Amino acid sequence: MPRHTATPSPTASQPSRRSRRRAWIILALGLLGLGVLIERGARVALAPPGRAGRFVAEFDALLKPYRAAEGPDAWPEIATAITLRGQLETQAYPTTGSQNYDWRFDALYTPRGLLDNRGPTQDDIERAENAIRIAADLGLPAVLDRIAAARRVVRPSPEGEVIGFMLPELGYCRYLARYCAGRMALAARTGDHAERVAAFEHALALGRVCASNFTLIDYLVGVAIHQLAFERLRADLVDHPLPPEHLRAALAAIDRQPLPPIATAIEGERLGLLDTIEWTHSNLPNNDGHFQPARAAAAMGLITGSATSALHPARWPAPLGNLAGWFLPTKRQTTRRANEMFEGLQRSIAPGIPARERTTVFDADTWLESLPANFVVVRMLVPAFGRALESSDSAAMLRDGTRLALAIELHRATHSSPPDSLAQLVPSILPALPIDAVSGRPFGYKPPPDPAAPTPGY
């Protein structure tokens, strides 16, 4: 029986025209997509970088209240005080240089040394007292008088990247504040009431000047200086009481040397962050752009930890490394999230909101934890605002507590007894009773059982 062999049909042995057409279309679309991908990748990799300095006008407007005040400028006097501080170190202890703290002013008011756990020796105390005498001969108190009287504070605006703006004056101002604290302690022991109050106001003035600038660290240094001044005044208030006229002078000094609101520093941080976002992203015509890791690493020292690996985008040649920015939020998206956070912060510190209720309005730390990890610049550069706000609240509470302590002592000095309630201090001594910045409630007060007994302390 003959065997029949099946003949393959043309449609089974080769693609149909329709299949070939579909394959060509898919290939063409793939090549087109690849071309678009390459073109957009090249645009990201080769895009011109953003530039720093776009927000100089905003910085100037922010600081205008402190720069437009009438009278002399405090900032040149800060430079003069720093120069005298160098001369003071050289003359007070010429054999060891500026890094030796054996003649520190802390020896006059603290039981522990800065560099060890021993208390100050008599030699330490004598060196500190000698340094205070040398400072007076150099004219340092007179310079601090001019700083206290000056309402204007004009530190030069930042040029270039704000994040690289150096603040060397802050450390020197803290040194000068410790010098003032040493003067206060020495004057308390010797009964020089005018010198004690003058040194107190000098320290407050240094804090005010530092805090009248645009960064959070400026503000926190001002807070720390004020805390030191208030603590030193209160510590000696019972054992070394001030006469009524000097109690009034200390109250007036507090009113003359207030810290500016922390809202100014927070707005300065926002402008600084926007500046960093601007120059770490490319500059596209629609005011958008992509993060450029290589540029950021070169300018900010980002090559740490895993960034030291040769595989990390920050170590790639700039055009190639910039491709990593394609997978991160754009400049516009990053700016929007940064503004969202700072707007929430400003709402939370509005007048009338006590510290205990602040996080119910906006919790910066919780917000930052919930921010996606790919918002690199925001997550990396936003400071710990929770701690900063706590320091500000603490300084406000210490200021108002010191004001009340001075008022109570003034009432005692003029009436031979402490007040029965804080209400007796108004309006003869204080225009109004302060409110606790933390609780939002009035300060508590319990009069001593024996009005004739000395105050146990503040």
Regions found by a protein language model. Give the residues of each.
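Short acidic linear motifs
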Residues: 2-458
